[in-house]
């Protein structure tokens, strides 16, 4: 039978505390080193550091250089001299001016308007401004300006063709087919091939006047001109003091009817002062006084007491 008594008390040996190793560094990173490593792993930070830092350095150097007014002036002078020497090279110099599509008189006006002192660098010629100055001339409808190789400044113009003469007060003005001014005319005899228009607002209805003249071609040699009446309609003035009064609407058709009537009845060869076509299909004739008396006598009407 085993004994129930406890064994004799023995002291439990104590464990000695671990010795600290001296001279060895803790491999774990410090807090700031850890944060720096995490920041460096950020792509945006790496890009900003690799690109932004050199840019900031360059800007800082440039700012230090340009901080001096003398340095700025010296660099500006050097740059200007470099640009001038480049622009004045022979291959960029314009020595000739060519004007195509213009009459000799208009060509002289274009040269005087441009007033270029050649030779001149092509960089000193404003082509847009030169074109605007040329197109400001009344006789020029359109212009093209360009620099060609060989030092040639080429100007191509489309000249306005005079289509009619506008009598304004005591002056004669040449107009093109749209009513644009071309030039002044000293004497009517200088352009006997062109018809004359007159009256208030005549210059604004040139296309219609030209259509009327085209329809009146069979009697064109007798036409002295067209007069604008009330800025609404036209009167055709013929020789022998005759006048054809046209309607406001469809004046060309009225002229065509008049030509057909004249070819059938020789109407304009008679003693007629005016033909009023303002009422469609009802032309009204105004006879000369002596012709009217002859008609009355033929009808047996006494004209002895009449002044007509």
From Swiss-Prot:
Q: Mind telling me which residue stretches traverse the membrane in this protein?
A: 47-67
What's one GO BP annotation on this UniProt entry?
FtsZ-dependent cytokinesis
Q: Name one GO cellular component term.
A: cell division site
Keywords attached to this Swiss-Prot or TrEMBL record, sorted alphabetically, are: Cell cycle, Cell division, Cell inner membrane, Cell membrane, Membrane, Transmembrane, Transmembrane helix
> According to its UniProt record, where is this protein located?
Cell inner membrane
The way this protein sits in the membrane is described as: Single-pass type II membrane protein
Q: Which domain of life is it from?
A: Bacteria
Q: Which PANTHER family match?
A: CELL DIVISION PROTEIN FTSQ (PTHR35851:SF1)
Q: Can you say what this protein is called?
A: Cell division protein FtsQ
Name the source organism: Cereibacter sphaeroides (strain ATCC 17023 / DSM 158 / JCM 6121 / CCUG 31486 / LMG 2827 / NBRC 12203 / NCIMB 8253 / ATH 2.4.1.) (Rhodobacter sphaeroides)
